[in-house]
C-alpha cells in the first residue's frame, strides 16, 4: 500500500475576518461621506433656486422699466414675462425670460404676488422642495429679498 501524501497547496483568497474588516471600513466611510454629499446636493438646489429668483426679479424690473409697472394678476403675473398680455404695448419681442415659465430647482413654478406683502411692490418666492406653503429645512419657502 502506498501512503497517501498530503499536498500543501497555498490557499488563495481572503479570510472571513479580512472581508469583515473591509466591510466595516466601507461602512464607516459611507456614514462619514454620504451625509456630506447629500447635504451639498440639497444646498446646490437651494442656491440654484435663489439664483432663479434673482434672474426673475431682474426680468420683473426690466418689465417695470418698459411698462411703468410690475406685471399684475390681470396681466397673468409671471406669465407676462414670457407671453405678451393684450394690455401691454412696450413688451420686449421674445419676452423677458427665455425658456418658458420660471421654475425652481424642484421643477415647481415660482410664486409671484403683486402687490406684495408688508408694502413691497411684489413677493417672489419658491415653496421649497415639497412644493407646498410653509415647511422647514428644504421644505421651507425661499423668498427673493433684495427689493
Task: Name each region found by the language model.
Residues 89-104:
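Short acidic, Pro/Gly- and aromatic-enriched capping/linker segments at domain boundaries
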Residues 11-37:
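N-terminal single-pass transmembrane signal-anchor helix
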Residues 1-14:
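N-terminal leader/signal peptides at the extreme start of proteins
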Residues 40-86:
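Conserved hydrophobic/amphipathic alpha-helical signal-anchor segments
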Residues 4, 46-47, 58-61, 65-67, ...:
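Short, surface-exposed interaction loops/tails
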Residues 70, 97, 142:
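Short clusters of hydrophobic/aromatic residues that line enzyme substrate/ligand-binding pockets
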